Structures are given as structure tokens and as C-alpha cells.
Amino acid sequence: MAEIQTAQNPLKELEKILERNNKQKNKKSRNQVRREKKKLLREKTNSGAKLAEKNSDDKDQLTENNDNLYNDKKSNGNFYDTNKTDSVDGMVYTTIVDSVELDPNDPLIEQFKDVFNRFKADGQEKDFEDTDKGQIMYSDDEILSEGEEDALQKQQEEKLSKKKLRKLKRMTVAQLKMLSEKADVVEWWDVSSLDPLFLTHLKAYPNTVPVPRHWNQKRDYLSGQRGIERQLFELPSYIRATGIVQMRNAVHENEADMPLRQKMRERVQPKMGKLDIDYQKLHDAFFRYQTKPVLTGFGECYFEGKELEADVKEKRPGDISEELREALGIAPGAPPPWLFAMQRYGPPPSYPDLKIPGVNCPIPTGAQWGFHPGGWGKPPVDQFNRPLYGDVFGNVKPRIHAGTGSPVSTQHWGELEEFEEEESSEEEESEDVEYPTEEITERETIEEYQSASEPRSQREDLHAEPLTYFNQSNVEVDNVELRKNTQPSSDAANRDLYQVLPEKSTNISGFMGPQHQYDIPTAEDTLPQKRNAHSMLSSTNKGDVALNQSSNWQDELSELVSEQAMKVGAAKRQKTQSKRDKFRL
């Protein structure tokens, strides 16, 4: 048995080896697998086509069988079985009958009548709407009346969508220009707004800030300037005139030749004064030759490509510059080339107040009418030789309009009040009040000096009616000098050069408090002393005062006036300061 098993084992191994070799031989390449797949796909498509043909044949045969059975049933009068299965050539089919004739005397029919009615088809067929086609009118009788046209138009509007209706009802650009106040503000997209007339009214309103042009652009803002090379910044002409550009170039050339070590050293310790320009050149550049830069005006908004547009603000209609005359070849004293067209068609309607010589105003002196070279054409007149567009002959005298209206206020709305003007007005009012008070004090002192030398009876008569603020104008004093005497006095040589101020002992208060303080006498402190001395002098030496009245009383009077003026000025300053604090923003 052991020998038989050993003999069988090598045989099995040989069989395995042979099978492995056969598998390797039968292994297909990629191209073979691809070809087999294509072959299978072709077989599937062919089989599907054959199956479809077979199904169509079976379907035709089934319909023929159904028709035959329907005709047989109809001939026999048996319509009770509406769904019946029959078999023809092994095929099972169902016959469907359109209508069934039932016995009206059957009681079950009354019960199931509603059920049967639900399965009945409606006899009325739906009318399919024909496509809209143009109508051909062969006679006047076929013309629709107004009511029929409105009904037809209403029917057509019901068929249209909302978007198409909006487009039909939309105003055209020409109509909007005719209805607007200024046709030049109308743009082609204004007709699609909610209220085109109101939009054009807002755009035509004076001093209206326009909407930027890039509001309807679908691309990014300033994306059109990506490929444009920007110019380098150039200094203004008045700065270039100082010669600083040449000096900077020379300095840069010297720095280019310097070694790296020296450049690093100058970065740490730079040398100053390399660009030394004359002060007079700098002064003239910035104070004499400086020009105003181009700035965006009020109401202007930047848009893409604004810097590339021509600036026409400085240009005025009707003014022909010398450059334009040279470009058009207009000789001196000759008319412009568009004059003949204006004489024929009229002046431009956009400029109704523009004066054009030869159209609505006289031609210049030395010019002649006619169509010869240098002639100014034919004056625009009617059949009665009357000017059409204006005083082309210069016969009408200019009218001088008298200024009968109210004066125009030049003050801007919303302008802040100037406190200086208010202070000046207050000063004027205070001065009006000051002078009478000063005159009162001066006159009172004069009366005191005069009363010292008069008898008592005369003084009582003088002061019988007291002097008040309201009747101060009744007092008249002659030969009163209110100013101090400019001549040097006799005691000028005995005056002290300076005065020693007494020092006060104070405690230091605060972070920056003073350590020393001095007692400085003011005018208010000296005033009572002078008044006491004056009263003592008037009581003791009345006769001496009367004799020396012309020598010393004028100086004291001027001092009293100055003290009173100081008091009034201090009160006025305090009042204005309180007003400033009140109206301070």
C-alpha cells in the first residue's frame, strides 16, 4: 500500500504541473480581452434589436386578436364582461370595452349608477388653442371695431408674461428726452427705472452730485487699468526750477561709485548739507511761482478713466483761442467756418444766451457782409428785413436795469457766528456808556474845586437840583483837558528810578507752587489814599487850592478818569469772557 501511495503522489504532482502549464497557455492578453468585450457588446445589441422586432410583431398580432374578439363580441351582443382574459397561441391578453349596455330594469344598476358614471369618458373634447398667426384682411368689413380691438389686446396681454408686459409698457429713450427738462442728462438705461421722469428731474436739478459711471459695471473696480503702465511721479515746475533734480542726480551718481563699507557708514552717520539750495530760490519757488494743483471740485466723484478725459472747465462756448485759429486756418478778422450753417439753421439751442457775431449780434468792426474770402455771409433776416435771432445790425440800444429789488444777502446759510464782531459791537456800546460816566466824574471834581472858593449860598443854589445820569447833557464845562500834560513836570528829576516791593512769606501749594510772592500795589489800592488826601486838602487849604487850581488839579483829574476807565474795562472783559464760555463749542 505504501508503494502504491508513493506511485500516486508523483502522478498527482505531474497533473498539477500540466494544469498549471495549460492555464498559462490559455491566459489571454489585454488585446484579446478587449476584442472579446467588443464582440459581446455587438451580440447584445443585435439580440436587443431582434427582441424588439419580435415584441413589435407580437404586439401587432395581439392587437389584431383583440380587434377580432371585439368584433365577435359586438356581433353576439355580449358586452357584460368588460375585462376578460383570453389566450391565443399561448399568449394571455385582456380585452377592454369602451361602453357597456346594461338593463335599465335591473335594481342593482340603480345602486351602482354613480360608480359606473365615474368611469365614463367625457364626450366633450378639449379645444386645443391654435398658435397665434397673423390675420389677413380681405375687405373693409373684416376690420375690427374699437371694442373688439380692446378685447383682443386684453386677450393678448393675458397670454404675455410679466417681463414682456414691462418691456411693452416701457418708455423709449426718445420719449423720455422729449418729456425731460434737460435732454442731455438722459441715458439709455434710465428708461428701465421705476420712475424715469422723477429720475431725470433729480438728475437735471442744479448742483446735483452725479452717480459714478462704474455703478453698472459687472467687472471689478479699476480692473481696466491693470495693464496700463503708470507714469513716474514728476516734481512740479516751480520746484524743478530750483535745480534740485540735477543736484539729486549728482548725489546719486557719487553714491553709486562709493564702496559698500562707506555706504554703510553713511547710513549710520549721514552727512548733512549735501543739497544746499539758495534761500532766495526756495522763497521765490514757493511764494512767487507756486501754482495750485489740480484738485477734485465740489460734487465731483472719481470714476475709472477720469484722469484721461479732457478738462473743459476752463473752456467757454464762443471763445476761439489762438491755437484753434491756427489749427482751423482762420485768418485774422475772418469768420469761423460754422458761421454760414448757423445763419441758415440758427444758433445752437443748448446755449440760448450765447452771443455769436453775424447771427444774433453785430459783426466786428472792419468786417464786411458777403460770401467773398473773409466775408461774414448774409445776415439772417425775414422777408420784411427783420432779424430772426437777435440784434444782428446793432440798432437796439442796451437797457440799463435799475436796481429796484432788495439787496442780495451774501451771507452763507449755516455760517458760524464770529465772536469778534459781537465783541466789537459790545465795545462800542460800552464806550457809549463810558464817556458820559467819565464826563460826570470829571465835572463833579471840577464843581468840587469851584465850590471850594464860592460862598455857601451860591453852592446851595448850584446843588438845588441834583445832577443825575439822565440830565447830564445839561452840564457844560469849557476848557477842560482830559489828557495828561505832555510837558515834563518840575519834579521829574526827583522821581525814583525803581521801587522796592515788599516780599510776602507764603507756603508752597501744589506741584508747581511759587515760593516767593511780592506785594504789588494796584490802582484800586492807591485810589482811596488819593481821595483822602484830596479831601484833607480841600478842607484845610481852600484858598490855596483856589489859587493853584490851574497847576495840579488837571493831573489828578486825568488820573481819576484813567482809574474809572480801568474799572469799566475790567467789567467789560469779564462780561465778554462769560459770553465766550457760554457759546463755546
Swiss-Prot record:
Stretches assigned to coiled coil: 1-74
Phosphoserine modifications at: S145
GO cellular component: catalytic step 2 spliceosome; cytoplasm; nucleus; post-mRNA release spliceosomal complex; precatalytic spliceosome; U2 snRNP; U2-type prespliceosome; U2-type spliceosomal complex
UniProt name for this protein: Pre-mRNA-splicing factor sap145
Keyword Phosphoprotein part of the UniProt annotation: yes
GO molecular function, one term: RNA binding
Organism: Schizosaccharomyces pombe (strain 972 / ATCC 24843)
Signal sequence coordinates: none
Lineage: Eukaryota, Fungi, Dikarya, Ascomycota, Taphrinomycotina
Major localisation: nucleus
Keyword entries, A-Z: Chaperone, Coiled coil, Cytoplasm, mRNA processing, mRNA splicing, Nucleus, Phosphoprotein, Spliceosome
